[in-house]
């Protein structure tokens, strides 16, 4: 059944329910960046497989919004469909709210599954529709009604993260959160984001691909806590441990009844940016304190134990990636290698490292023109052979018990054109300048983003994605609230970079139809002294994989930039020390790449 037939069935349901529009987002019940298969209704209906996008279906047309990362991919996957591509943020492209205001009649009805739509997005739509007396029908999962073979809701076993890995016990975290609640006057704290629940309880799961979280909600009061979860995913031992520290268990789907049962006027803190619309509607009688969860900043600022573990994880990851680069450059052109088989080979190298848990996201292994598609993921349909020329852009990562990694290396596979060498070098200039930044405490990513982009801007080049994102500790590979981007997303507050945060440093350049360049390291924000101007911070590089000097146009690098490139060498020495006593062959592979 193609997308046109699926939309026809959906429109039949819309007509039966008296709906003038139906909105399908790319979210689960928790506002997660990546979602389990059960929640991929937008993908099922449209055929667009990117991780970000919103589908709006009208009685006689349909449109899909996505961001700059996916413009090329969406154009390709929607070609020949009846769905119009809306390139969000581009000139002349209306917002979803403005589009609905133009198309939905006075007194009309807009439908959506309120469990998957964030309260913030619903408010944005309502503001755009103000004055039209439009009704929201938010209790109808029409997409599910026309999806006969929908996957079941995930219910994978939960496991416990050792306290020595986290640096704080769950009891200590609950105590700290209750202190924050007293400061804000919250009587109840509702945690709806999966990574926040997992972080608070030092638990991990496998309900979302590549993200070690489990489907759950957590209600926290001063004297008690309730975890709404599918109880079959908890072992008897874990249940006993949770109860022992004051955490009661309740069915996952009971969250809305429990919220409605909170006495009127009770001060309840939740975050409309992540809490779904049904959560907020269930709190209609409470005094809602709408603000970011205190967990967000607490988990972003890694404990000393987490910081030390992150370093250990990157040594392991560095060994695996160096071995992969050595293998790839030695074998390309001599044996059949495709994007998919290369990604599998890198995964096999990571799997040989102790305490490896799995990939932190689906690998981007992109040869030649595919590298220009920012978030390209090879599939059986798109897979191509690697040839001894141009670049292979490898954006990959892994979860280890000691931490999460995210690295991009643009690997030369053979002779390069002058344009490829120039682009590789200019992007590296931006990466080095940002990584070397020393800056006052209190600055945010917006202030620093220009350091990475300026070398490209000077050449009339740019990239249509953020420069950096936070990284969780055996959680989401993308986490906030910190980010590096000159453009602030709508309704998002600025968060200053702080000691202990982990951020990516990943400028890029993409020549459509030709090649893509991205250089990505993870950086740990560290204190850099204090003087009469206040405290200063700097970045400590965590990633320990060298950049390929054979791809550089050295004449474009200043002496300072060459020195910065050489300054990364001590990290490679740590890789060598980590393996020289156990595996001489691996040591040779690392030295060859370095």
Kindly give the residue locations of the regions a language model identified.
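Active-site neighborhoods and metal-handling regions in enzymes and metal-associated proteins
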Residues: 1-558, 563-567
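Conserved non-cysteine loop/helix-boundary elements of the Radical SAM core domain that shape
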Residues: 557-594
């Amino acid at each position: 059944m193609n997308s046109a037939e699926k939309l026809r069935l959906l429109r039949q349901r819309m007509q039966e329910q008296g709906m003038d529009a139906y909105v399908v987002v790319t979210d689960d019940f928790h506002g997660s960046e990546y979602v389990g298969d059960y929640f991929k209704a937008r993908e099922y209906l449209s055929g667009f497989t990117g991780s970000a996008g919103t589908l709006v279906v009208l009685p006689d047309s349909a449109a899909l919004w996505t961001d700059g990362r996916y413009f090329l991919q969406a154009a390709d996957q929607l070609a020949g469909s009846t769905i119009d591509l809306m390139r969000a943020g581009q000139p002349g492209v209306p917002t979803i709210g403005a589009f609905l205001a133009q198309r939905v009649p006075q007194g009309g009805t807009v439908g959506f599954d309120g469990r998957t739509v964030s309260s913030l997005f619903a408010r944005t739509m309502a503001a755009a529709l103000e004055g039209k007396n439009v009704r929201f029908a938010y209790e109808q999962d029409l997409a599910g009604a026309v999806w006969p073979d929908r996957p079941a809701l995930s219910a994978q076993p939960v496991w416990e993260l050792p306290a020595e890995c986290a640096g704080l016990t769950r009891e200590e975290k609950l105590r700290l959160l209750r202190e924050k609640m007293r400061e804000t006057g919250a009587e109840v704290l509702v945690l709806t984001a999966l990574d926040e629940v997992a972080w608070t309880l030092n638990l991990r799961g496998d309900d979302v691909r590549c993200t070690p979280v489990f489907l759950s909600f957590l209600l926290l009061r001063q004297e008690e806590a309730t975890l709404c979860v599918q109880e079959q995913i908890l072992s008897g031992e874990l249940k006993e441990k949770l109860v022992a520290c004051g955490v009661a268990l309740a069915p996952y789907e009971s969250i809305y009844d429990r919220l409605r049962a909170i006495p009127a006027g009770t001060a309840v803190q939740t975050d409309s940016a992540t809490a779904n619309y049904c959560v907020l509607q269930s709190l209609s009688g409470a005094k809602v304190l709408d603000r970011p969860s205190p967990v967000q900043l607490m988990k972003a600022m890694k404990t000393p134990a987490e910081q030390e573990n992150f370093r250990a994880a990157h040594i392991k990851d560095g060994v695996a990636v160096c071995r992969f680069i050595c293998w790839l450059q030695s074998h390309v052109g001599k044996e059949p290698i495709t994007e998919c088989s290369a990604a599998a080979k890198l995964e096999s190298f990571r799997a040989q490292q102790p305490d490896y848990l799995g990939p932190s996201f689906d690998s981007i292994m992109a040869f030649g023109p595919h590298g220009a598609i920012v978030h390209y993921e090879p599939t059986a349909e798109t897979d191509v052979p690697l040839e001894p020329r141009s670049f292979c852009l490898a954006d990959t990562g892994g979860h280890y018990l000691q931490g999460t990694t995210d690295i991009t290396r643009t690997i030369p596979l053979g002779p390069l054109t002058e344009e490829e060498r120039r682009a590789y070098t200019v992007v590296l200039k931006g990466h080095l300048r940002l990584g070397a930044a020393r800056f006052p405490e209190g600055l945010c990513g917006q202030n620093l983003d220009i350091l990475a982009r300026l070398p490209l801007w000077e050449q009339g080049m740019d990239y249509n994605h953020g420069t950096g994102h936070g990284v969780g500790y055996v959680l989401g590979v993308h986490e906030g609230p910190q980010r590096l981007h000159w453009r602030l997303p709508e309704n998002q507050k600025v968060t200053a970079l702080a000691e202990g945060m982990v951020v990516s440093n990943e400028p890029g350049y993409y020549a459509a139809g030709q090649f893509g360049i991205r250089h990505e390291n993870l950086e740990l924000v560290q204190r850099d002294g204090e003087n009469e101007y206040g405290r200063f911070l700097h970045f400590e590089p965590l990633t320990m994989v060298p950049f390929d000097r054979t791809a550089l146009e050295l004449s474009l690098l200043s002496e300072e930039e060459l020195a910065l490139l050489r300054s990364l060498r001590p990290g490679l020495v740590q890789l060598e020390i980590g393996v020289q006593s156990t595996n001489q062959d691996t040591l040779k592979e690392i030295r060859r790449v370095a």
